[in-house]
Amino acid sequence: DLPIIFCSTSKITFPGSGVAAMAADENNMKVIKEKYKYQTISFDKVNMLRHILFFKDIDGVKAHMDKHKCILKPKFDIVLKHLKESVGPTGVATWFEPNGGYFVAVDVMEGTAKKVVQLCKEAGVVLTGAGATYPYGNDPKDSNIRIAPSYPTLDELEKAMEIFCVATKLAAVNKILENM
């Protein structure tokens, strides 16, 4: 009876105003429909129509995502290049190369994520808050930082990643010295 799949166009059309969908097998759909039949979600029908008229079908969604890829791939390439070349050899951070999505999750040395974000901010680079992927932003290891490269220009991103990598290494060195 699994999986139950959820998706949204929130990041690909209008942030906060996308259309969400759910897919499941017939048995799960019966249970879900029964459980939620008395709730009123008050869908924005005009917004749904906008999305249908814009995308038309799955091929329209795929074509639109290809446009996103043309814009985002060079930005993700910059992020990954800096991580691999500057931070990777030091061992003070790990990350996964995303296969889609809009973020790169970086795990810096335990106990340094907030410091990295602070150092970046002091240098003029604003990041998503440390631990933002955790409930209430509470990362028990203070190690997770989510990089969102979609907004800055390529030149801005190059500079921002240089600063991020220096801040990551500096915070790690300071943490090591604290523990000596």
Label every model-predicted segment.
Residues 7, 21-23, 97, 103-107, ...:
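Short beta-strand segments
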Residues 10-13, 26-29, 56, 100-102, ...:
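Short, solvent-exposed loop/turn segments at secondary-structure junctions
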Residues 66-80, 92-107:
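Conserved glycine-rich beta-strand-loop-beta hairpin in the small C-terminal domain of fold type I
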Residues 33-34, 53-65, 84-85, 89-94, ...:
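Inter-domain helical "communication" segments and dimerization helices
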Residues 126:
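Residue-level detector of anion-binding/catalytic polar loops
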Residues 122, 138-180:
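PLP-dependent enzyme catalytic core of the Aspartate aminotransferase-like
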Residues 2-73:
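Conserved core segment of the aminotransferase class I/II
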